[in-house]
Amino acid sequence: MQIVEKAPAKINLGLDTLFEHPNGDKEWDMVMTSVDLADYVMLESLHTNRIEVVTDSGFLPNDRRNLAFQAVSVLKRYCHVDRGVRIKIRKAIPVAAGLGGGSSDAAAVLRGLNRMWNLHLDLATLARLGLQVDSDVPYCVYSQTAHVTGKGDVVTPLPKLPPMWIILAKPKVSVSTPNILRQVNYERIDQHPNIEALLAGIQQQDFAEIFANMGNVLEPITAKRYPEILQIKRQLLTFGADAAQMSGTGPTVFGVCRKQSRAQRVYNSLKGFCREVYLVRPVNLNEH
């Protein structure tokens, strides 16, 4: 039996961290959405109890370091399942880019195995299990515009974003999320994004309010080490994006445009400066 699951990339329209838990986990306050740049995850039953991971990327491990592998282990343990699976991942999302590719692949594994093994778990349970793999997995289980709080485990769906176009641009660097998070100093955070105003803008479908209140508290940390991030951000705004910022821990920067024609111009202009550029739209996975 074979199951195929789509694993969309995510971006952070708003990203704030409020404090650190005693175990080192961050307390998050984020607004996230998924876009139509996606990996595809194929699951095949095995006659043995093995977990096999096959990818078309030379940058990904195929053992227990892979988040998709970990997702299988968590689900097997929770449901007391003794079955094997081969996971084939067709990558489109750049690796170590701040776009949640590994987490989305892991979430796709949870959704797909839930179907393949007839486990009948709801998305809330899958999201709770996903937190054992990575803090972005609970959101990626849903993969729809949402307000994400707690350790990443409290996912509150939001209305669809108003129609907009998004230009993603990844500089030629890869970022280690743990390294960036270790550098967070709460006493030195000068400016927190106004997440409440961003949420209000989405509720009201108000472009100006959304664009004015986007923000990522981690951007200064990553950009200090990788100045290319601010260069790309400036280029996005110069070429006509309505707003621009870094996604996640970076290094991918995205610009947003209300109109497709302007987004296409920004995309075409940026292609001359950055090799990995994508023109995408917001997507809610449950609509496909």
UniProtKB/Swiss-Prot annotation:
Protein name: 4-diphosphocytidyl-2-C-methyl-D-erythritol kinase
GO molecular-function terms, A-Z: 4-(cytidine 5'-diphospho)-2-C-methyl-D-erythritol kinase activity; ATP binding
The organism's place on the tree of life at top rank: Bacteria
Source organism: Lactiplantibacillus plantarum (strain ATCC BAA-793 / NCIMB 8826 / WCFS1) (Lactobacillus plantarum)
Gene this protein is translated from: ispE
Leading EC class: transferase
Similarity annotation: Belongs to the GHMP kinase family. IspE subfamily.
Catalytic activity: 4-CDP-2-C-methyl-D-erythritol + ATP = 4-CDP-2-C-methyl-D-erythritol 2-phosphate + ADP + H(+)
Extent of the signal sequence: none
Known EC number: 2.7.1.148
Physiological role: Catalyzes the phosphorylation of the position 2 hydroxy group of 4-diphosphocytidyl-2C-methyl-D-erythritol.
Keyword Transferase: yes
Keywords for the protein's UniProt record, in alphabetical order: ATP-binding, Isoprene biosynthesis, Kinase, Nucleotide-binding, Transferase
Chain sites annotated for binding ATP: P94, V95, A96, A97, G98, L99, G100, G101, G102, S103, S104
